[in-house]
Amino acid sequence: MKPDLYGCCGRVLLLLLIAAAPDRAQQDSGLARAPAPDTAANRREAGTRAETDTTGYEQLRTVKNDAFALGERLVFDVNYGFITAGEAVMEIPSIDTVAGRACYQVDFEVNSLSSFAWIYKVEDRYKTFIDVESIAPWKFEQHVREGSYRRDFIADFDQIHHVARTTEGTHPIPAYVHDIMSAFYYVRTMDFAGSHPGDIFMLHNFYKDTTYDLGVKFLGRQELEVKAGTFHTIVVEPLVKEGGLFKSEGRIVIWLSDDERKIPVRVNTKVLIGSIDTELTQYSGLAGPLTARIR
């Protein structure tokens, strides 16, 4: 069976990464239920960022970042029903120089547990290099190993001349376009204090040969208990459309810690049979205190 775009299990964790710049309302949710009313309240920005965009062609913005730092490490269980099928790790092991810019190296790995690998073995590796100042990517790598399926993809993003050079071709990109990993780290710099249920904001994400738009709905706030603790969380939902970046048989809901760190706490997504839950089990090396943790 050939996985879609990002791979089966890898795609579940990558759904953690789908929120970014809120610049316009999503007009068509692509979901069965009615979309949120097109009101001024629902068109407000879901978050605001302390950033400065300059008008010079070769000038990059500066984004204030108190959300993450070198050394952060997040560990998750990937559960299918009552079975823990795999483990995922997101971490920032180093700061490297890419295209002459200081960049966070961010690694993301998804592995099936040995007890589940005999059914379906997963060894997925993703890597992105995110500009320390602009929180925009300069390079993205994907190495998927799922069952007999193999895929390797690399994209170099020229954030000055707005071109993506990939293993599959060269393509124009908008300013500050994201890969699926850098998008998540960008949203963590945002302030959701003024967000209201029903607010919709957008991600602009490049993959393969296309820049995709994906609407994300702010659902509200909730107290949530997982292995890593009990947290105050922000709850969001990607508005999945047929033919879009993600394809899903059902609803996807994401919980982020409701504080300056905005670390992913849980993801629930429907599959053909049942659902997959991804839950935070460990965290370390955070940029500051995790005030959303209750106990």
Language model: regions and residue ranges:
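Acidic, serine/threonine-rich low-complexity disordered tracts
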Residues: 28-157, 194-295
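Bacterial N-terminal signal peptides that target proteins for export
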Residues: 1-12
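N-terminal processing/targeting junctions
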Residues: 11, 23-24, 88-89
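Hydrophobic h-region of N-terminal signal peptides that target proteins for export
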Residues: 15-23
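Hydrophobic, well-structured mid-protein blocks that either form specific transmembrane helices
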Residues: 149-191
